[in-house]
Structure formats: structure tokens, C-alpha cells
């Protein structure tokens, strides 16, 4: 599966129109793009007690997308649905070079290992993106470690509804904007609720993974192996869909 995380920013005052237009976009994608397996659109979760690193603007819109393959993503990315949406609604979004060129971050990823349960269709899931960085030269070791780790998450955490781990698209013509750090590791994950997320971070599966393999990742605390440096997004879904093909792993 090919995964894309993308971010737009709404110009203040245009929220209602933008959310309605984005909902219509998701419906059109669902109706006309069978190889788009999931297409989820969010605002940041800015509820009290939710920490996001770095803190986002409340005007941010975050897309979490999954495709049959890279070709399906490119078909969407350059296709009529998105092209028409930007032509009509581009002025609602922050832009640097005019209303038909909204400022966007595009993070294109190749799924390494993971699962998505059917419960992920619940729009109230606690959706999280976390981006770690491998230390140079450790890609093979990280790949091997992730297989058993993700299996253990699935087997032991029924409240974890999505847990996919992806590496950056390393092709020379990667459509990522800006180009991604090639040692990035991106977790797209979701839980039944915030409590299930907190439990995941404290339970043995995650803690044992850090103890055994944390040294393979860049650390936020010098000398530590238990504090991987990461940036995060915590999201509230307001539009989108998942097809049955999305339920992998």
C-alpha cells in the first residue's frame, strides 16, 4: 500500500466553506477512485490535555490517505477530482503563489508493515501520526524489528485500530513536498479512544520495543534509548471513507 499524509491550511473565516468542500471532495473520490483505499480528512485535536509536537495551527487540515499502489496515488494527485477542487476552492486555503497553488505539505510513504482493523471506520477514533528518524545504517535492523513489534501490537491491543509503519518513498521522482528525510519512519495509528492510546504507550509491547531497539533511532534525550525524537499530529476526523481493501494485516 502507498500512503500519503498531506497538510493544507484554511484562510481564517473560510472554515465552514472549506469543511463542506472537503467533505464533497472525499465523497467524489469515494465514488470515482476505486484504487483509493482510504481517504480521511481531519482537523487538529486541540482538546485540553492533548499534546502535539510541534503545536499546529487550528486552521490546519490533515489528510491521511491510502492507495493500492504508487500509480493510484499519482492518478489521484494529478487527476480531475483534486484538480477541480483546487481550481474551485483553492482561494479558501493559504497560498504562496496564488489561489490555484495552495501551500501544502505532502509526505509520500511506502507501507513497510502494519494493520488496519474494520473498527477504524469509526470517525471518533483517536488518530495519531508520529514521525521518528532512524540512525544512519540501521534500516535493515529497523525493518526486522518492526515485523515482530507490529504483530505484538495487533495481538495484544484490541483497542488499537490502525497501526501502520511506513518509510519514505525513495524514488528519484518522489512527489513529496518538500522532499522527505529518507531515514524517516512514519507511524499512522488510531485507537478506540485517548485512554487506549495512553495504555499503548505504557504497556509492555511498546516499552519492550524501545528497550530492545530504541538505540536504532535518533533520541530526544542525549544518551537515552527510550526517548525517540519525534514530531506528531493528533487528529479529529470530519470526512472520509475506508474501503474493505484498506483492512490489511
Where are each of the predicted segments found?
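Short, well-ordered beta-strand segments in beta-rich or mixed alpha/beta enzyme
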Residues: 2-9, 40-78, 124-133, 165-203
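N-terminal/domain-start segments enriched in small and hydrophobic, helix-friendly residues
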Residues: 7, 11, 20-28, 32, ...
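Short amphipathic alpha-helical segments
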Residues: 14-41, 81-85, 89-90, 138-165, ...
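Short, low-complexity cationic-aromatic patches
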Residues: 33-34, 118-122, 135-137
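Glycine-rich beta-strand-turn "strand-cap" elements at beta-sheet edges
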Residues: 40-57, 84-125, 161-183, 207-249
Amino acid at each position: 500500500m502507498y500512503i500519503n499524509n498531506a497538510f493544507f491550511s484554511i484562510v481564517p473565516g473560510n472554515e465552514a466553506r472549506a469543511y463542506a468542500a472537503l467533505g464533497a471532495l472525499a465523497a467524489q473520490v469515494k465514488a470515482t477512485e476505486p484504487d483509493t483505499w482510504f481517504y480521511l480528512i481531519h482537523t487538529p485535536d486541540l482538546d485540553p490535555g492533548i499534546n502535539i509536537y510541534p503545536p499546529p495551527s487550528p486552521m490546519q487540515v490533515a489528510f491521511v490517505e491510502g492507495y493500492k499502489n504508487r500509480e493510484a496515488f499519482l492518478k489521484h494527485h494529478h487527476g480531475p477530482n483534486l484538480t477541480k477542487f483546487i481550481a474551485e476552492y483553492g482561494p479558501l486555503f493559504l497560498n504562496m503563489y496564488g489561489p490555484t497553488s495552495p501551500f501544502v505539505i505532502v509526505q509520500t510513504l511506502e507501507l513497510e508493515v502494519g494493520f488496519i482493523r474494520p473498527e477504524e471506520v469509526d470517525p471518533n477514533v483517536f488518530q495519531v501520526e508520529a514521525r521518528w528518524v532512524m540512525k544512519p545504517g540501521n534500516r535493515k535492523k529497523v525493518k526486522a524489528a518492526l515485523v515482530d513489534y507490529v504483530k505484538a501490537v495487533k495481538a495484544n491491543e484490541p483497542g488499537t485500530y490502525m497501526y501502520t509503519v511506513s518509510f519514505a518513498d525513495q524514488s528519484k521522482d518522489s512527489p513529496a513536498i518538500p522532499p522527505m528525510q529518507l531515514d524517516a519512519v512514519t507511524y499512522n495509528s488510531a485507537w478506540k479512544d485517548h485512554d487506549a492510546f495512553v495504555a499503548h504507550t505504557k504497556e509492555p509491547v511498546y516499552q519492550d520495543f524501545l528497550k530492545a531497539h530504541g538505540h536504532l533511532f535518533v533520541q530526544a534525550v542525549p544518551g537515552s534509548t527510550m526517548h525517540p525524537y519525534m514530531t506528531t499530529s493528533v487528529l479529529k476526523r470530519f470526512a472520509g471513507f475506508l474501503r474493505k481493501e484498506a483492512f490489511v494485516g
